Amino acid sequence: MVSSSVSSVTEVKVESYVFPPSVKPPSSTKSFLLGGAGVRGLEINGNFVKFTAIGVYLEESGVAVLSGKWKGKTAEELSDSVEFFTDIITGPFEKFTQVTLILPVTGQQYSPKVAENCAAQWKAAGIYTDADGIAIEKFLQVFQTESFTPGDSILFTHSPESLTISFGKNGAIPEVSNAVIENKKLSEAVIESIIGEKGVSPAAKKSLATRIAEILNHFDA
C-alpha cells in the first residue's frame, strides 16, 4: 500500500536546508512525499559554486504509477535510466519542486534562463506554438518584480495540464500560490530542466533514484 511506502520516507538535508519527508504545496489539499533532493551548482574558475538546493516531491499516487515498471530495480539502474526520469516528468500525477536559494537572485535573473531553455527545446523539436509563447510571457511576468535571498524558495507544482508558481520566504511554504499557467509543455519542461537527461542538478537526480528505489521496495499494490 502507498501508506507503507510513505512511512519509510525520510527528510533530506542539502547544505543547511532541510527538505521534510512530506509537504502540502500552496493552494493544494494533498500531501506530497519527498522523492529526492540535491544541490545545483557550476564549476567557476576551478571552484564548485552552489546556487540552489532543490527538492523534488511526488503526489502519493505517483508511487503506484511508477511501481509497475520500476519496482525491484536498483538505485543505479534507475539513476542510469532516462526513461525512469521521463516517467516521473510525464506521469499522470502531480509533482512539486522546491528551489531554495543558497545565493541571492532576482526574478529577472532567474526566469529568462528557464524560459529560453524551454522555448529553444520546443523550437528544436518543431512543437513551439503561439500558445506556448503566451505561456512563456506569463512565466516571465510572474517573476518580474521578485527578488530572492538565501533561504527563500521558488516553488513549482507540476500538474498534468498546468504549472502553479509560488514564492516562499525564509524557508516557509505559503498557503496560496502566485500564479497558475495552463500549459502542459511548460509544466513538464520546468521539471525536466531539473531532472531530465540534461537536468541542472545531478545530485537531485541521484537522490531521487536512490530514494524512489527504496520507496518502491516498500510498496505493496
From Swiss-Prot:
Disulfide bonds: none
Residue(s) at site: Important for catalytic activity: 110
InterPro entries with a match to the protein in the record: CFI, Chalcone_isomerase, Chalcone_isomerase_3-sand, Chalcone_isomerase_bundle_sf, Chalcone_isomerase_sf
GO MF, one example: chalcone isomerase activity
SUPFAM superfamilies for the chain: Chalcone isomerase
Binding site for substrate: 52, 117, 193
Catalysed reaction, written as an equation: a chalcone = a flavanone
Enzyme Commission (EC) number: 5.5.1.6
Keyword entries, A-Z: Flavonoid biosynthesis, Isomerase
Extra remark: Part of the biosynthetic pathway for all classes of flavonoids, a large class of secondary plant metabolites, many of which are brightly colored.
Family: Belongs to the chalcone isomerase family.
Function of the protein: Catalyzes the intramolecular cyclization of bicyclic chalcones into tricyclic (S)-flavanones. Responsible for the isomerization of 4,2',4',6'-tetrahydroxychalcone (also termed chalcone) into naringenin.
Protein name, UniProt field: Chalcone--flavanone isomerase
Native source species: Gentiana triflora (Clustered gentian)
